Swiss-Prot record:
It is a multi-pass membrane protein. It comes from Methylobacillus flagellatus (strain ATCC 51484 / DSM 6875 / VKM B-1610 / KT). PANTHER family: PHOSPHATIDYLGLYCEROL--PROLIPOPROTEIN DIACYLGLYCERYL TRANSFERASE, PROLIPOPROTEIN DIACYLGLYCERYL TRANSFERASE. Pathway: Protein modification; lipoprotein biosynthesis (diacylglyceryl transfer). One of its GO terms (cellular component) is plasma membrane. Keywords: Cell inner membrane, Cell membrane, Membrane, Transferase, Transmembrane, Transmembrane helix. One of its GO terms (molecular function) is phosphatidylglycerol-prolipoprotein diacylglyceryl transferase activity. Pfam families: LGT. Disulfide bonds: none annotated. This is Phosphatidylglycerol--prolipoprotein diacylglyceryl transferase. It comes from the Bacteria.
Length: 261
């Protein structure tokens, strides 16, 4: 049995000001997006022919960051705590309180990329296929931030690597944040980076992202402690699982359509 180290959530103390680990994880995700994106533009010439430049990459990050933050926050309020935020709508703006939803952030990014595509004269799936392999690094960094903060812990377990989170209780639990780091971060990155290493049918890389993330998230949710204010929903599935199922279904449909073109 392992014990969570209970890290200080503030990574860097600067007098009365502190830089939190979770903020650093966002920064790592954004910087990795730029570095990997520039590598692809320089070493995979078909992306340049599709209209990708360093300027477009920088602007895509700006649009995407807005989509992640706004969509993630609104998604959390809508999917997880809608009753609370209906009576406290102004607190949606308090980003330092409450949480963020990946599925809301994903929808926010889709809207942002639609606007970006229209403004730059690019195709939506041309953008999403380029962006999709860059995203898992940020997802993995975010899950590592969850682990450092000791949040989103797993269900009770007697496995050798089960971990006690002392600030929660004395029960050994799945370190589900690390499972998500390995699957949604490392495994999904390797899969998408490999698949997109040569030209593919338009939409197929995006489809693989939907299938991969949705499947990994659905599986890990079986080890993750359900949100106390929601519990399990219909068929004993969590909110995260119900939100991930449409991603898998849409991904399978999109992959079939893409490969038939």
């Amino acid at each position: 049995m392992l014990v969570h180290p209970q890290f200080d959530p503030v990574a860097i103390h600067l007098g009365s000001f502190g830089i939190h680990w979770y903020g650093l994880m966002y920064l790592i995700g954004f910087l990795a997006f730029l570095w990997l994106g520039r590598w692809r533009i320089a070493h995979q010439p078909w992306w340049g022919k599709a209209g990708w430049t360093k300027k477009n990459l920088d602007d895509a990050l700006f649009y995407g960051a807005l989509g992640v933050i706004l969509g993630g926050r609104l998604g959390y309020a809508l999917f997880y705590q809608h009753e609370y935020y209906l009576t406290h709508p102004h607190e949606i703006l308090f980003l330092w309180q409450g949480g963020m939803s990946f599925h809301g952030g994903f929808l926010g990014v889709m809207v942002a990329m639609l606007l970006f595509a229209k403004r730059r004269g690019l195709t939506f799936f041309g953008i999403m296929d380029f962006v999709a392999p860059l995203v898992p690094v940020g997802l993995g960094a975010g899950r590592m931030g969850n682990f450092i903060n000791g949040e989103l812990w797993g269900r009770a377990s007697d496995l050798p690597w089960a971990m006690v989170f002392p600030h929660v209780d004395s029960i050994a639990r799945h370190p589900s944040q690390l499972y998500e780091f390995l699957l949604e971060g490392v495994a999904l990155f390797i899969l998408l980076w490999w698949y997109s290493s040569k030209p593919r049918a338009r939409g197929s890389v995006s489809a693989l992202f939907l299938i991969g993330y949705g499947s990994f998230r659905f599986l890990v949710e079986f080890t993750r402690e359900p949100d106390s204010f929601l519990g399990l929903l219909s068929l004993g599935l969590s909110m995260g699982q119900w939100l991930s199922l449409p991603m898998v279904i849409a991904g399978v449909w999109l992959l079939i359509v893409s490969l038939r073109r």
